[in-house]
Amino acid sequence: MNEKNPFIWQELVTSDQETSGTFFSKLFGWNLKQVDAGKFGTYTLFQKEGQDIAGMMNPTVDTPGEGSYWHSYIAVDDIDNCAKQAELLGGKVLVPPHDVPDVGRICAVSDPTGAVVHLMQPVDNS
């Protein structure tokens, strides 16, 4: 299926990666791969059959919400324009577009009701 704006990545935000990682790896048979995320600490990749399928990160000052939760990313072609459009449509930019090395550009916006969604303009590996 070649769909426009698909959900392309899921990420767990938790202050206890060890407990959450153990839980989900045992529940679903996922493997864990930890990588250094610099100032953000450890980023953990959930893997199945050697493929990255989701991520896990520590909360940051820019991370919307409280407690542990999952969030999803929707692919967009032009993240800067999409963030501007979100504001024009009555939403808010919660985390401005910024680069993530080897991933692309990401941001978080909310709709007028407060529902949060994360956007990603993936790096072009072609």
How would you name each of these model-derived features?
Residues 30-67, 112, 116-122:
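Conserved short beta-strand elements that form part of the metal-binding/catalytic scaffold
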Residues 15, 20, 40, 54, ...:
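Residues in flexible loops and secondary-structure boundaries
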Residues 1-15, 33-36, 45, 62-85, 105-110, ...:
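Vicinal oxygen chelate
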Residues 49, 72, 90-93:
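Preference for short coil/turn "hinge" residues that link or interrupt alpha-helices
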Residues 2-51, 88:
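Core segments of cupin and vicinal oxygen chelate
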Residues 22, 69-72, 99:
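Residue-level preference for alpha-helix termini and adjacent loops
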